[in-house]
């Protein structure tokens, strides 16, 4: 019995220590979250897709081909262009690889954007081989996967301009580029617009190319940033460092070819060796910041 008070005291001290430890952990956890949030806000965030036009961004990040003292570069990977643009519009990213028609749509709705340059992105309208469609005129009563207010929506208009179909063409909004390709593989869609490397995979499975944006003389790929960034000297330094890294990646991709970076392409585009072996030549033009007054 003599030892009971001592035992109780030890328990109280232990519980107090545990309580202090828990409170300390909560405090540190809050401080850590605040620090991480601050770093995230200060970083230059770039929205990218699992497509070849985004390869300079992926490669620059992987190789650290930018001045890390000037920019903390963070990639925000999305499978749908509309998600990248929503992030850009909401300012949760500063830069995005997108298309000219999406830029026009966002600008029309009051989003200030700065075009850094173009990409070599192209889109092919590919029909499911089971649909027996060889031309745009045969798309009557067929479903075409695309994204509203985008390059694919615009290209659908152009492909059908002056074309007489036997019935209306049904445009189905499938924004996720990977799901879009899967729907073609699973015979769930009659036709769709695809860019690389998804277009190569579709051709590999003997699906039919009926239109090509290059033959239509349409060059719609762009890299854009929020226009408000140019008012912030720190952001301008970040963009300058990003542009330098991006252009260095372009030079390497143009020199060695995209197949040289097969492992990276497989990882970021969720594709395979067979597709990469069949990829056509792809060019990567430089981007630049506008001259400041």
Give residue spans per PLM region.
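Periplasmic-binding protein-like
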Residues: 118-129, 204-235, 239-246, 281-286
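Secondary-structure end/capping motifs
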Residues: 232-293
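Short, glycine-/small- and polar/acidic-enriched structural segments
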Residues: 21-172, 183, 190-196, 210-213, ...
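Bacterial N-terminal signal peptides that target proteins for export
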Residues: 1-7
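C-terminal motif of bacterial Sec signal peptides marking the signal peptidase cleavage site
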Residues: 16-17
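Sec-exported extracytoplasmic/periplasmic mature domains
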Residues: 62, 89, 108, 161, ...
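Loop-centered beta-sheet repeat module
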Residues: 180-183, 202
């Amino acid at each position: 019995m003599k030892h009971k008070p001592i035992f109780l005291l030890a328990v109280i001290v232990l519980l107090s220590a545990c309580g202090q430890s828990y409170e300390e952990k909560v405090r540190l956890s809050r401080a850590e979250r605040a620090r991480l949030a601050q770093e995230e806000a200060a970083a230059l965030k770039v929205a990218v897709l699992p497509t070849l036009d985004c390869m300079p961004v992926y490669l620059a990040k992987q190789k650290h081909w930018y001045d890390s003292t000037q920019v903390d570069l963070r990639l925000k990977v999305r499978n749908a262009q509309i998600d990248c643009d929503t992030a850009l519009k909401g300012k949760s990213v500063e830069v995005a690889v997108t298309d000219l028609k999406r830029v026009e749509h966002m600008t029309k709705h009051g989003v200030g954007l700065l075009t850094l340059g173009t990409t070599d992105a192209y889109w092919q309208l590919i029909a499911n081989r089971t649909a027996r469609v060889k031309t745009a005129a045969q798309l009557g009563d067929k479903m075409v996967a695309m994204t509203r207010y985008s390059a694919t929506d615009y290209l659908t208009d152009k492909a059908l301009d002056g074309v007489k179909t036997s019935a209306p063409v049904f445009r189905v909004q499938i924004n996720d580029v990977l799901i879009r390709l899967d729907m073609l593989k699973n015979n769930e869609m009659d036709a769709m617009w695809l860019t690389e490397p998804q277009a190569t995979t579709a051709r590999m499975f003997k699906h039919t190319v009926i239109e090509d944006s290059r033959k239509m003389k349409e060059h719609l790929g762009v890299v854009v940033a929020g226009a408000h960034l140019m008012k912030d000297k720190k952001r301008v330094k970040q963009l300058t460092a990003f542009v330098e890294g991006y252009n260095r990646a372009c030079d390497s991709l143009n020199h060695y070819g995209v197949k040289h970076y097969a492992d990276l392409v497989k990882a970021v585009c969720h594709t395979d060796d067979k597709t990469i072996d069949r990829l056509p030549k792809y060019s990567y033009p430089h981007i630049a910041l506008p001259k400041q007054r």
